[in-house]
Amino acid sequence: MIKGIGIDIIEIERIARALEKNPRFKERLFTLEENRGFIEKGGHPASIAGVFAAKEAVVKALGTGISNMKWKDIEVLKDSAGKPYIKLHNNALEIAYSKNINEIFISISHSKENAVAQAIAT
């Protein structure tokens, strides 16, 4: 049963500007494992924007605002085939448990200008 749906779209250029302005941007919003993934992919802003959009989509699927958790409470990882999956921590995990959410499916894509992600909580 679907318990929540979230979608987010972001301009890749917005993330590129944030990376230029604040060198600690990635450290503040993304986990160590997520940052390792960015390095492996060459640190392209489109990849970073996709993961950011995924985090936003998950927040919406959980039905809460980000004020109830930290960005690092939502981790976007990839399996051995490269498929993204969500791992929740701390408050995000507690919120999911309280709503009887067992899994969050995620899809991420981007064009030249935008990154988009959709999350479905079950």
From Swiss-Prot:
Main localization of the protein described in the UniProt heading: cytoplasm
Cofactor: Mg(2+)
Pfam families, A to Z: ACPS
GO cellular component, one term: cytoplasm
Gene3D superfamilies: 4'-phosphopantetheinyl transferase domain
One GO MF term attached to the UniProt entry: magnesium ion binding
UniProt-annotated binding residues for Mg(2+): D8, E56
Record's subcellular location: Cytoplasm
UniProt GO BP: fatty acid biosynthetic process
Keyword Ribosomal protein: no
Enzyme class: transferase
Catalytic function, reaction form: apo-[ACP] + CoA = holo-[ACP] + adenosine 3',5'-bisphosphate + H(+)
Keyword Transferase in record: yes
Keyword terms, alphabetized: Cytoplasm, Fatty acid biosynthesis, Fatty acid metabolism, Lipid biosynthesis, Lipid metabolism, Magnesium, Metal-binding, Transferase
Entry EC number(s): 2.7.8.7
Transmembrane intervals: none
Family annotation (HAMAP family): AcpS
Record family assignment: Belongs to the P-Pant transferase superfamily. AcpS family.
Function summary: Transfers the 4'-phosphopantetheine moiety from coenzyme A to a Ser of acyl-carrier-protein.
Protein name in UniProt: Holo-[acyl-carrier-protein] synthase
Organism (species): Alkaliphilus metalliredigens (strain QYMF)
